[in-house]
């Protein structure tokens, strides 16, 4: 049995599986790290040499659930929820 490049073509097992952080099939099973987002490290993997990849993954490309409401709260001066003052009839 040879151990060189000949045996590289004979592999049938998956080296990568789905990543639980980014969802891509980039999580290396033996290394236990994601090649795409760098999971389980705390910071997301990103490099300046891949500007196009940064554009795909940056803030504003997903649902931006929280950011949608920020401009609305900014206009009202970031007021917290407060009870409305009752208007009593002046006597």
Swiss-Prot record:
GO annotation terms (biological process): translation
PROSITE patterns reported in the protein's UniProt record: RIBOSOMAL_L37E
Protein residues bound to Zn(2+): 19, 22, 34, 37
Entry keyword set: Metal-binding, Ribonucleoprotein, Ribosomal protein, RNA-binding, rRNA-binding, Zinc, Zinc-finger
GO molecular function, one term: RNA binding
Listed InterPro entries: Ribosomal_eL37, Ribosomal_eL37/eL43, Ribosomal_eL37_CS, Ribosomal_zn-bd
Textual note on the cofactor: Binds 1 zinc ion per subunit.
Recorded family membership: Belongs to the eukaryotic ribosomal protein eL37 family.
Free-text function comment from the UniProt entry: Binds to the 23S rRNA.
Listed name of the protein: Large ribosomal subunit protein eL37
Lineage of source species: Eukaryota, Amoebozoa, Evosea, Eumycetozoa, Dictyostelia
């Amino acid at each position: 049995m040879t151990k060189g490049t000949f045996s590289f073509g004979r592999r049938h097992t998956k080296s990568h599986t789905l990543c639980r952080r980014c969802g891509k099939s980039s999580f290396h099973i033996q290394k236990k790290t994601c090649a795409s987002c760098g999971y389980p490290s705390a910071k997301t993997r990103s490099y300046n040499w891949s500007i196009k990849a940064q554009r795909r993954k940056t803030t504003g490309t997903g649902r931006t659930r929280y950011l949608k409401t920020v401009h609305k709260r900014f206009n009202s001066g970031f007021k917290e929820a407060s009870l409305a003052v009752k208007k009593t009839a002046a006597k």
